[in-house]
Amino acid sequence: TAENPFTCPECGKRFSQKSNCWHTEDHTGEKPFTCMECSKSFTVKSSLLSHQRVHTGEKPYTCTQCNKQFSHSAQLRAHISTHTGVGPFPCTECSKTFSLKHKLYKHQRIHTGEKPFQCLECGKSFSVKHGLLKHQRSHTGEKPYACSECQKTFAHKTTLMVHERIHTGERPYECNDCGKRFIHSTNLNCHQKIHSGEKPFTCTECGKSFSLKNKLVRHQKIH
């Protein structure tokens, strides 16, 4: 097109300026711009200049709201959303906004159903890498989170946090009917059936119903 007359011979992507021909280095893997401090290499000079701020400490981008300074323009854009409450990257499906583009891409998988991270052990797939890493512990048996009180270990941080309530006595889940408090939300849900009279577990032998599954299992031993 007239607006983008320069074409990459490798992938057909078009550019408005011939100087953008550095894009072809994405295909060749060539990285001619090297940092003199740490020897890290880059495909374009602008990326090198941006990287060098890690070493110089230069922060040329300033927030006009609070004067906080940043090394990169993307960091400033993400920060500005803390003042406005609106991120610069909106989701076209649900209008939710994000401070960073990669967070938008991650969110969009909710709508597309894309799950690019697959477990090599069982084939289960996940939309985010963190989900895969957590899942893999079910195969490796890794339990990196240890209780500081009793040294019991857990595969997930959330499970550790729930366990710690045994030591702290914290009971964050309160029954609205009687005020009784519980460590786990599942315990509260079971308790609330006392007030509601709900008995969702039915014996297939005699039709008797129970509020809790363990009561049904105990009853079934009669038959």
Curated annotation (Swiss-Prot):
This is Gastrula zinc finger protein XlCGF52.1. The keyword Metal-binding applies. May be involved in transcriptional regulation. SMART domains: ZnF_C2H2. It is found in: Nucleus. Belongs to the krueppel C2H2-type zinc-finger protein family. It holds the Pfam family zf-C2H2. Transmembrane segments: none annotated. PROSITE patterns: ZINC_FINGER_C2H2_1, ZINC_FINGER_C2H2_2. GO terms for cellular component: nucleus. InterPro entries: Znf_C2H2_sf, Znf_C2H2_type. GO terms for biological process: regulation of transcription by RNA polymerase II. It comes from the Eukaryota.
